[in-house]
Regions:
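Carboxylate/His-rich catalytic cores and anion/metal-binding grooves
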Residues: 221-252
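Hydrophobic or amphipathic alpha-helical targeting/insertion segments
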Residues: 182-217
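Beta-sheet repeat architectures centered on beta-propellers
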Residues: 1-93, 172-192, 308-323, 329-579
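Surface-exposed extracellular loop regions of Gram-negative outer-membrane beta-barrel proteins
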Residues: 281-306
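Beta-strand initiation motifs
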Residues: 166-170, 210-214, 253-258, 297-302, ...
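Small/polar beta-strand repeat architecture
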Residues: 96-110, 115-179
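A short beta-strand motif characteristic of beta-propeller blades
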Residues: 55-64, 168-174, 211-216, 259-264, ...
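Surface-exposed ligand/attachment interfaces on beta-rich extracellular proteins
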Residues: 62-67, 102-109, 116, 209-224, ...
Length: 579
């Protein structure tokens, strides 16, 4: 039969990200007025972010004061390096390959099967959740001679994929007054190494055996930033020579003889950061940016990129999607090489959320950033003194075909970060104010604390703000990754207090699509029901109430949801009278 209902459909995809610098008349329906703890999804839509969980179960030890925070977390040589106070420590992490019940007996001859034992000592103590184990030997994928519930801990149930980590081992001491670290992984002589600078003490180099050696040259002690370029090590940011960049001899991070190829360059501004990009070393300063090109002392050349724009904080500089991204005084910027060889283009990319940067740049004490390469995503964290983790904020930037899209983060307070790709596995780490090293993109909570996701659409008038729309139905297209428990709100007339405010519409699912061979079996009593052959992007049809001249959709989850993606919406309404 022909449709005589006079219902008007209006469908849109969720795309465009958070937009705070346009009026509702200019915003596209798929853009967002609020997008908190969602991320623009490279597969389309807005995805409620994953959480983070402990990568090392043991807290990084305090060295002298309870006020100490982790100053560094870095992956190197199958170890996690962490700095706190005056010391540098190492640990190792893996995952349990089988489930262990509380009644499983492990009393000196037990075996724990794990993903890998790379980086672990040949014997020692490990921890799963809060239970400690000892072991006397290792093989490629197991700990042997295992005894459980040691050190007065209690045997407990541990699920498959639970994190296993070893106790922290002291690797370097005496780093008096150390501040937040920069580091660089490098290989000058066929051996993998990592160099660390802490803004106060001598740079320190670790080899793959995690043996520490200080750089002996006094002129680079106290360097704040470091970078390997053209087989030289470059040091900068020392408080007594803030405009000088010192570089070592080729292939020798601790050789500084000018006759052997070492030297220095000066710029006319305080150096903030060093970053290699393609064939140049970019020197970010407070109000200027330079780049160094060449291959040796004889032909190194420094030229200005811009004398009007600088970098606010060295920990915001990252290589991202083939560009360099950094925090300037007016928000996020890129340094992008154009088609013309040797030319450089500077672009501001964060105008859509300029108000977020204006609010946080002036108040943040520290900044951190990470790149999640498999999502083409950059995250920046604004860390304010005395602010609780639950209200600490940040932002995401995702590069999509149409351009950059943004969202806001809330509930992550970092003290240091690292991203490392290991055999295709992207590992994103951060240290937090509780003293733990956490792994981002893990789980559905912030280490046990709920994640509150919020989405708000623009005020949608569908081309005519003078016609009343009588809402009939909202159809939600989404992709769940597990059980979700979320609410849909429909509001009218720019959320005017006198407009209709219908009760919330529960938006949840316990029936998940699954493919044979990859899903777990469920029963009629299971909390989650797996439906073979179900669609990955289901439609949830909600009959709704109310009317108004503009319509707003809100989605808010209560913090106990697994991640899910909002793909799009269809609104169905009938036209009413003109105001």
């Amino acid at each position: 039969m022909p449709d005589s209902s006079q219902v008007q459909p209006a469908a849109f995809n969720c795309q465009g990200g958070l937009v705070l610098n346009r009026s509702s008349f200019l915003m596209e329906p798929g853009q967002a007025r609020e997008l908190e703890n969602f991320e623009p999804d490279i597969q389309g839509g807005y995805r409620r972010i994953s959480g983070y969980s402990k990568f090392i179960n043991q807290v990084v030890p305090i060295t002298s004061s309870t006020a100490e925070e982790p100053l560094m977390s870095a992956l190197f040589a199958n170890k996690v390096l962490a700095a706190r106070g005056e010391k540098i420590f190492s640990s190792a992490s893996t995952e349990l390959s089988i489930r262990i019940t509380a009644s499983t007996t492990l009393s000196g001859s037990g075996i724990l099967t794990v993903a890998s034992t790379s980086g672990f000592s040949s014997s020692g103590t490990i921890q799963i959740d809060s239970e400690k184990f000892t072991y006397t030997g290792i093989s490629t994928n197991s700990f042997t001679g295992v005894t459980r519930a040691t050190s007065s801990t209690t045997a407990a149930l541990h699920s498959k994929l639970s994190v296993i980590s070893e106790d922290w081992t002291v690797r370097d001491t005496g780093r008096t007054g150390a501040k937040k670290y920069h580091f660089e992984r490098f290989n000058f002589d066929g051996n993998e190494k990592i160099i660390l600078v802490d803004q106060v003490n001598a740079p320190v180099v670790f080899n793959s055996s995690i043996a520490a050696t200080d750089v002996s040259e006094s002129s680079v002690a106290g360097a704040t930033v470091v970078a390997a370029y053209r087989n030289h090590m470059f040091y900068a940011g020392k408080s007594t020579i803030p405009q000088e960049v010192i570089f070592s001899e080729p292939f020798n991070e601790d050789g500084f003889s000018s006759g052997a190829g070492a030297g220095s360059v000066k710029v006319d501004d305080t150096v903030v950061a060093l970053k290699v990009f393609r064939n140049s070393l970019f020197i970010f300063c407070e109000t200027r940016i330079f780049k160094l090109t060449g291959s040796s002392l004889s032909d190194f050349v420094v030229e200005p990129v811009t004398r009007n724009i600088g970098c606010i904080n060295s920990f915001t500089v990252q290589e991202f999607a083939g560009d360099l991204i950094f925090l300037g005084p007016d928000g996020l910027r890129t340094v992008a090489a154009t088609a013309r060889i040797g030319d450089t283009e500077l672009g501001t990319i964060s105008k859509n959320i300029q108000s977020i940067f204006d609010e946080n740049i002036k108040d943040a004490v520290e900044f951190d950033s990470v790149v999640i390469p498999d999502k083409t995503q950059y995250r920046i964290f604004f860390n304010k003194a005395g602010q609780a983790s639950s209200i600490s904020k940040g932002a995401t930037c995702v590069l999509k075909k149409e351009g950059f899209e943004f969202s806001e983060l809330k509930g992550l307070k970092t003290t240091c970060t690292d991203t490392f790709v290991e055999r295709g596995d992207v590992i994103v780490l951060h240290g937090d104010v509780t003293g733990f090293v956490q792994r981002q993109e893990s789980g559905s909570t912030f280490d046990g604390s709920t994640i509150l996701g919020k989405y708000r659409s623009p005020d949608m008038a569908f081309g005519d703000s003078g016609i009343r729309k009588h809402m009939q139905k909202v159809i939600i297209n989404y992709r769940p990754e597990g059980v979700i428990d979320t609410d849909l709100f429909v509001r009218y007339d720019n959320e005017d207090k006198n407009s209709a405010r219908p009760a919330v519409y529960p938006f949840d699912t316990t029936n998940l699509p699954s493919a044979y061979g990859s899903a777990l079996y469920s029963t009629t009593s299971s909390t989650t029901q797996f439906a073979y052959g179900g669609g990955q992007d289901p439609l949830d049809r909600k009959s709704v109430e109310g009317s108004g001249f503009s319509i707003i959709l809100r989605v808010e989850d209560d913090g106990v949801s697994n991640p899910y993606s909002l793909k799009g919406f269809q609104l169905e309404y009938q036209l009413g009278a003109r105001r």
